[in-house]
Amino acid sequence: MPASSVRLPLRLLTLAGLLALAGAAALARGAPQGGPPSPQGGPAPTAAPARGPTLFVLVGDGSAWFVFQLGGLGALNDTRIRGHLLGRYLVSYQVVPPPVSAWYFVQRPRERPRLSGPPSGAELVAFDAPGVRRTYTTAAVWPAEVAVLADAEARCPAAVFNVTLGEAFLGLRVALRSFLPLEVIISAERMRMIAPPALGSDLEPPGPPAGRFHVYTLGFLSDGAMHQTMRDVAAYVHESDDYLAQLSAAHAAALAAVVQPGPYYFYRAAVRLGVAAFVFSEAARRDRRASAPALLRVESDARLLSRLLMRAAGCPAGFAGLFDGRAERVPVAPADQLRAAWTFGEDPAPRLDLARATVAEAYRRSVRGKPFDQQALFFAVALLLRAGGPGDARETLLRTTAMCTAERAAAAAELTRAALSPTAAWNEPFSLLDVLSPCAVSLRRDLGGDATLANLGAAARLALAPAGAPGAAAATDEGAEEEEEDPVARAAPEIPAEALLALPLRGGASFVFTRRRPDCGPAYTLGGVDIANPLVLAIVSNDSAACDYTDRMPESQHLPATDNPSVCVYCDCVFVRYSSAGTILETVLIESKDMEEQLMAGANSTIPSFNPTLHGGDVKALMLFPNGTVVDLLSFTSTRLAPVSPAYVVASVVGAAITVGILYALFKMLCSFSSEGYSRLINARS
């Protein structure tokens, strides 16, 4: 007989027994009998109101749960009811291990500084819709009626992450397949435990002394690390009432969970995210409004961080939404259009031009050493890799690879270390996207010696899919642990795993720098490089029939400078600098006439990568052409004259004519004076 067929009669017997016990308890007290509540937890319309405290029992087998109203709390002393409470179909008291008095928490959580609020002039949206009344049930606390404002869940066989936001209420559940679960409840009202009669009927769940809210942490006290985690997360909500500070802490905690996989980091990051959303919703609920950029920021961060956390737990899932339709209806500022398109999974076609322009502008600023918006770049890259054509994806990766320099990777690593510091203070907003972009979404892998950056890159590439896309919320049991396709690898599938750096070309081929020769494709061994770190430049493609196993040496040349101001001869070429130590210093895509002129300006160039005076004598340069030609660049044969405007030519001609006229007049004056002077002298003598 199937197991499900056996469980059904047992459930019915259990329900019947509980109803009988309820009737017996009610008759013993002389109280009117009431009908059972609905499966959703609400009382039946015909139920009479209970007198005094009422006992609720949570019944279920994991797939469905029901709440039944039995009677007064004194019924707990009934051995028959106690037997049911300890039965197979009911929850266990051991969720919170006794003695509760042994638990201790941080007494006065430290306050973090308040960050700047929404930008001035930001459009405000109403946040005054009442929550939907629901009964919140848990394993060890009596059910509570909550006005739910938001409810989100990410689930797969490896992990479950659930957040319920209500009016002055947060319920958060986290569970991992290989570790014990954790639950956090934040409430304005005091709550009571479902505890054995020996502990009393008015026992408060474990938590720190009440501040603005009551905070309860429920879990199995398995070891000291779990105990410390439960103590720490209980203090989060009282650390700051600024949602930006809480979001910054959530990003840092998610960063720790991604680079240092483990249940405790996962739990801390999940609670941080839930608390950040709770602090924001409470502020918006009290003010009855919220700024549109702030609501979009919280919504997008919730979806992004939940996906990164679930990915770290081993499954492709994440929140499909937090504030339901509230965030989707907000007006979007021009600067937030890419974030909104990624967050809500909108049709990306209307945003592709904006995404291309964002990547191009970020690249132009990066080449000139100027700061750029790394968060906007992340969302632009996400849209182009997922919705753009093959040409869009490859050109985007070419630019992000060029933007990923050793200096930028070092800055990201330093930012990561600072964020992971236990003494980090969020004086300024911190976002994971400032660490992820652009190196994590590029084809540069030689800077990934730090496992932190390598883990971040893998997580970031899998988070590029739009958060609102179908299947982003939860994974089914059948396909939950199937590996998601890496959009970066999909855009350039020909690149081998051992590549240090790759530069995709149009047509399905790529320039690839490696330490050893690939199995297929022409390869150039770069001379003057340390034999311990050799550099090989190969051209690889997916066309196995065209495999050319040819070893070559790049030809050293003085390339001609172009004098044509209207033709860009070296556009779409890639300029590469590398050192004799076998290190790739930088790559620059020449995409405009202005960049070409800067390239040929030599020591006068304002682009640092092109200026040879900023590099030592052991640094060499290559020019990679789109047709696969590789040149060891020595110099340009001549310096191109600066373009002269027509107005300057006219002014020069007029000035020269005036100068000639003045000189001629002076000459005539001198000649006339000399002629008259000699005539007078001759006449005087005669």
UniProtKB/Swiss-Prot annotation:
Keyword annotations from UniProtKB, A to Z: Fusion of virus membrane with host cell membrane, Fusion of virus membrane with host membrane, Glycoprotein, Host cell membrane, Host endosome, Host membrane, Membrane, Sialic acid, Signal, Transmembrane, Transmembrane helix, Viral envelope protein, Viral penetration into host cytoplasm, Virion, Virus entry into host cell
One Gene Ontology term, aspect cellular component: membrane
Principal location listed in the UniProt entry: virion
Glycosylation sites per record: N77, N162, N542, N604, N627
InterPro entries reported in the protein's UniProt record: Herpes_gH, Herpes_glycoH_C, Herpes_glycoH_C_sf
Record's keyword annotation contains Glycoprotein: yes
Domain of life of the organism encoding this protein: Viruses
Post-translational modification remark: N-glycosylated, O-glycosylated, and sialylated.
Gene3D superfamilies registered for this protein in UniProt: 1.20.58.1340, 3.30.500.50, Herpesvirus glycoprotein H, C-terminal domain (2.60.40.3190)
Residues annotated as transmembrane: 647-667
Virion surface face residues: 25-646
Signal peptide: 1-24
Intravirion side: 668-686
GO BP: any one term: fusion of virus membrane with host plasma membrane
Cell compartments where the protein resides: Virion membrane; Host cell membrane; Host endosome membrane
Pfam families on file: Herpes_glycoH_C
Membrane topology of this protein: Single-pass type I membrane protein
HAMAP family reported in the protein's UniProt record: HSV_GH
Subunit and interaction comment: Interacts with glycoprotein L (gL); this interaction is necessary for the correct processing and cell surface expression of gH. The heterodimer gH/gL seems to interact with gB trimers during fusion.
Its biological purpose: The heterodimer glycoprotein H-glycoprotein L is required for the fusion of viral and plasma membranes leading to virus entry into the host cell. Following initial binding to host receptor, membrane fusion is mediated by the fusion machinery composed of gB and the heterodimer gH/gL. May also be involved in the fusion between the virion envelope and the outer nuclear membrane during virion morphogenesis.
Protein family (similarity comment): Belongs to the herpesviridae glycoprotein H family.
Protein name as it appears in the record: Envelope glycoprotein H
Protein's organism: Suid herpesvirus 1 (strain Kaplan)
Taxonomy of the source species: Viruses, Duplodnaviria, Heunggongvirae, Peploviricota, Herviviricetes
